[in-house]
Amino acid sequence: MPEIDVGSQIFDVVFHPTFATVYTGLLNGHVKAFAYNEQGKEQAAFSVRPSKRSCRGLSIKHDGTHLYAVGKAKALKYNFISGLIIRCSVIDTATAQISTRPGAHDSTINRVKYLMPWLISTGDDDGVIKLWDPRQQECVREYTQHFDYITDFLWLDDKKQLVATSGDGTLSVMDVRSKKPEPFAQSEDQDDELLSIVAIKGHSKIVVGTQLGILSIFNRSKGWGDCVDRVPGHPLSIDALCNLPPGLPNVDPTSTVLTGSSDGYVRAVQILPTKLLGVVADHGEWPIERIAVGGGWWVGSVGHEDLLRMTDLEGFFLDQSEDKELKGALGVTNENEQSDEDEEMDVLGNDAGHPEVDGSGSSSSGESSEDSEASDGETPQAKQRKRKIEQKPLDVDKPKGRNEIDVENAFFDEL
């Protein structure tokens, strides 16, 4: 796994849409670009510093000509007061020239998203979302439906809608064609911080990562009021989500996502039905903050460290397929695919006590009721089906830390 040492903690990472170049936004305010080859060997392309304060978010134009960077900075306005000014910088990716727009927000900007030609969006710590036309000095629209920080954006091009997730526990949908400052829709409070968002199944379903480690599934045809399914399994928060590029072998990119969790793992997870395909990258004790996929099927992941980790997705999925073929040739079965003789007894219709995570919500109980109705009129009882019960299908055994110890509960009873 190639690693690029950038010299400072990384807040965000994006890839050029056509060239083999990756961009990083750093804690020290630098934006560094690296060119890489098919073997993952990198070479520094350029380094600019739009601000002396941290660069929190990056987004790149569809043709790769401009890179948008946001963060926190101080500016001196004439000879008056030196105050907190939030900047939005535009970087020419060919010449590395910078144009800065001070005063874009009143608080730190966390996210920026290129939507379409002449329209970008920004979201800040106070939950304010603004739409910008780079040709104009002032924002074209401002939304204030959120009261906590904006965590992520998703652009739905078919309806020209911008979906934003927030730390206040809701997501909102804004129709950029409307001139109203109110959102088109807003979800109910999900009782959890919403941290990341991607679309699957041809943008018909939306996957949202939460602080409690649950993937919430929204169905666009059912409305935005509440999620239709919840997929547990991650032991800690899901801070980053990313789609897979088309053309990868042995995987359906329309139903598989990459998840970045605070436990330091980047996982490949199939949604509907839910299945852990494997651990793509391991950052050790460092939480995953951002994931991005670039040309050549490379995925870049960053955490609370100075390293950008590059992983070859094609090699990962080919290795997964070869492992399965080898086990099948040797007559070895996976733990999740053991024979009926080695699995625990689980009678259909008694699944309520042992729920399985299959991404289908209440469909399991519905199938159980149908089976029970069909068997009411039959005297002989149907053969009981045996299957293994998975409590945490997405959990991964984590090696014990250097200073970590095991303490029995009784130790705390005397305190």
Curated annotation (Swiss-Prot):
Q: Where is the composition biased (Basic and acidic residues)?
A: 390-405
Q: Which organism is it from?
A: Laccaria bicolor (strain S238N-H82 / ATCC MYA-4686)
Report the sequence similarity comment from the record. Answer: Belongs to the WD repeat WDR55 family.
Biased composition, class Low complexity, residue ranges: 358-367
One Pfam match: WDR55
Q: Where is this region: Disordered?
A: 328-415
Which SMART domains did the record assign? WD40
Q: Record keywords: Nucleus included?
A: yes
Fetch the InterPro entries from UniProt. WD40/YVTN_repeat-like_dom_sf (IPR015943), WD40_repeat_dom_sf (IPR036322), WD40_rpt (IPR001680), WDR55_POC1 (IPR050505)
Major localisation = nucleus
Q: What is this protein called?
A: WD repeat-containing protein JIP5
Which residue stretches does the UniProt record annotate as biased composition, category Acidic residues?
337-346
Q: List keywords of the entry alphabetically.
A: Nucleus, Repeat, WD repeat
Q: Which cysteines are joined by disulfide bonds?
A: none
Instruction: List where in the cell it is found.
Output: Nucleus, Nucleolus
Q: Where are the WD repeats?
A: 5-44, 104-142, 145-184, 189-228, 233-282
Q: What is the lineage of its organism?
A: Eukaryota, Fungi, Dikarya, Basidiomycota, Agaricomycotina
Record GO cellular component, one term: nucleolus
